[in-house]
Design a protein with these regions (language model features):
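Short hydrophobic "strand-cap" motifs at the C-terminus of beta-strands
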Residues: 101
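C-terminal active-site subregion of NodB/CE4 polysaccharide deacetylases
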Residues: 132
Length: 139
């Protein structure tokens, strides 16, 4: 199955609370992608948003059928915070997965975000995380 990434480039519409516009735009992508067997991941760029925006975006993404919500591209300030990850999990329907990007560089951090309900992680330190996991398994 293919994955269609929708990077939220509708920042002005979100900040002005024009969620009808945002929903229509994301819905169009979801319908086109799902019609071709692809999944849809909506990237928020949380460092630019207030909690109320993140909450509403999670609701909208669930309503229009997005498969994932993602904290950021990983290039913005701050990375995936516990606060944002818990908020996104709490505000998204159970069928919408949460992906953390930025700030997951150790096996312990991976376990911590997993405990918050994250099902996917974007990490540049994947090799180091896996090496740490293997070392622990060897005991």
């Amino acid at each position: 199955m293919c994955l269609c990434r929708v990077q939220l480039r509708l920042l002005g519409k979100v900040l002005s609370r024009d969620y009808g516009y945002v929903a229509a735009d994301v819905r169009a992508v979801v319908e086109a992608a799902h019609g071709r067997g692809a999944l849809v991941k909506v990237i928020f760029e949380n460092c630019f948003l207030q909690d109320e925006h993140k909450e509403e975006l999670c609701r909208v993404c669930g309503e229009v059928g997005a498969d994932f919500v993602k904290t950021s591209t990983g290039y913005g300030d701050g990375g995936a915070t516990d606060h944002d990850l818990a908020l996104m999990r709490r505000c998204s329907p159970p069928y919408v997965q949460v992906k953390a990007a930025g700030g997951v560089r150790t096996f312990d951090r991976l376990l911590a975000v997993r405990a918050l309900g994250v099902s996917r992680v974007g990490a540049t330190a994947s090799k180091a995380i896996l090496d740490e996991c293997r070392a622990r398994l060897k005991g």
